[in-house]
Design a protein with these regions (language model features):
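N-terminal metal-binding scaffold of metallo-dependent hydrolase/deaminase domains
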Residues: 1-48, 60-61, 446
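Histidine-centered catalytic micro-motifs
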Residues: 63-75, 240-249
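Metal-coordinating catalytic core of metallo-dependent amide/deamination hydrolases
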Residues: 137-288
């Protein structure tokens, strides 16, 4: 990986927000940000002695992908939980397997699992991750929060841009205490969470690529009044708040029994009377069984929706009713982001295609997430980039002046892309290619190769030297 990000690049094609353009020069400052973009015929760069751009022939640049929802430690379950002695396996039977891992894990194992997950994300084009982190304590009796800094250390080594979303997890369900392995998750109150956030804020391994946010694990695990307190303080601090919402029907049933309302109803009540976009900065993860009209209201109140298609399929959760929600509010499409969640498979391109494919299967029609031009791929790319950045409060997700130079380089000679025209390249990648079409990624202008063992083209050797 190169030591200095400064310099200029000119790939064969660069995504500039609506299309791929040829010959765009990207000038990257010493701070790892894009100083300017210069299109062919766009005039001279600042200063007559501007260095020539390093050409990247047969490469196309995209913004680095933003993974808005991850549980890195769950990579340790890969290959497990896929055997059922009888029909009827579901999220809850998988969760029992996950709790077994939680009970066994120590700092070294957590570091290795997190590092492996983050490196795999980089190879899949993911340059930023929102780590929804509730596995806090090595010693639950001491409430040591020993695992929080382990995850940050793994992210720094990978390296990957991370927002550590520190979770409040107070109960095993409404009115039920945490038991067994769950005790490693324990953060009882918003005050305890914010004290830990403040402590971690002074210990970030790299403040330029690491930041913090808050989580209410769910309205099963955190009572509504505590969620309200977390939301209020998160808004005051200007940090994101994420929570699982209506992934499982049992979650809905338990909340109705305890509080008389569904989780999304409770969440919408928190935003009532809060002025314009009272739920801005709040991201609801999954929303698998959320009523379409409530999804639309949540988005109109400023909320964002994180869908994790591969994990939701793996666990048999279901498919969120996005098509019906879009009929009620077209703004839903622009509020979407994506996550790899359980990390059973790490591929943002595949998450993006299944965001659309799941809706096609559910509704038996195509083009559910199409934009005004009738294209689906730009909506999917936005969910995988700028949508995730907005959900995490990051300045990433676009190739634009002033943004970090977090980039993905596609190999235009890859068999899945070689016949695609520039006008169809995004569709060819998202619907027809795998992560092996990713040649390299850049984090703040510093490049790393794609998949381990992948051949490095001569054009990239100077970047990766």
């Amino acid at each position: 990986m190169s030591d200095s990000p400064a310099g200029a690049l000119a790939a064969e094609l660069t995504w500039t927000g609506e299309r791929f353009e040829a010959g765009v020069r990207l000038e990257i400052g010493a701070d790892g940000r894009l100083a300017r973009l210069v299109r062919p015929g766009g005039g001279p760069t600042a200063g007559s002695d501007a260095a020539p751009a390093r050409p990247l022939p047969r490469r196309a640049l995209l913004p680095g992908f933003v993974n808005a929802h991850s549980h890195a430690f769950q990579r340790g379950l890969r290959g497990l939980g896929e055997t059922s002695a009888a029909p009827g396996g579901d999220f809850w039977s998988w969760r029992a397997e996950m709790y077994g891992l939680v009970g066994r894990i120590d700092r070294d194992r957590l570091f290795d699992l997190s590092l492996g997950a983050f490196r795999e994300m980089r190879a899949a084009g993911i340059t930023s991750v929102g780590e929804f982190h509730y596995l806090h304590h090595e010693d639950p009796d001491a409430r040591d929060f020993a695992f929080d800094e382990v995850v940050l250390a793994a992210a720094a080594e990978a390296p990957i841009r991370i927002v550590l979303l520190v979770a409040c997890y107070a109960a095993g369900g409404p009115g039920r205490p945490l038991e067994g392995a769950q005790r490693r998750f324990a953060v009882d109150t918003p005050d305890e969470l914010w004290r830990q956030v403040d402590r971690l804020g002074g210990r970030l391994a790299d403040p330029s690529t690491q930041s913090l946010g808050a989580v209410a694990h769910s309205l099963r695990a955190v009572p509504p009044e505590a969620v309200a307190g977390l939301r209020s303080e998160a808004r005051r601090r200007g940090v994101p708040l994420h929570l699982h919402v209506e992934e499982q029907r049992r979650e809905i049933d338990e909340c109705v029994a305890a509080y008389g309302k569904r989780p999304m109803e409770l969440l919408l009540e928190l935003g009532a009377g809060g002025g314009d976009e009272p739920l801005a900065g709040t991201t609801a993860v999954h929303c698998t069984h959320t009523r379409p009209e409530e999804l639309a209201r949540f988005v109109e109140a400023g909320g964002r929706i994180c869908v994790c298609p591969l994990t939701e399929a793996s666990l048999g959760d279901g498919i969120p009713p996005l098509a019906a929600a879009l009929e009620r509010s077209p703004a839903v499409a622009g509020a979407l982001c994506l996550g790899t969640d359980s990390n059973a498979r790490i591929s943002m391109a595949e998450e993006a295609r299944w965001l659309e494919y799941g809706q096609r299967l559910a509704g038996e029609w195509r083009g559910v997430l199409r934009d005004r031009a009738g294209r689906v791929a730009p909506t999917l790319l936005a969910a995988a980039t700028s949508g995730g950045a907005a959900a995490l409060g990051l300045p990433t997700g676009e190739i634009a002046a002033g943004r970090p130079a977090d980039l993905v380089a596609l190999d235009l000679d890859h068999p899945a892309l070689a016949v695609a025209t520039p006008a169809a390249l995004l569709e060819a990648f998202l619907f027809g290619a795998g992560d092996d079409a990713i040649a390299a990624t850049a984090l703040a202008g510093r490049w790393s190769a794609g998949r381990p063992g992948r051949a490095v083209a001569p054009a990239e050797r100077t970047l990766l030297a």
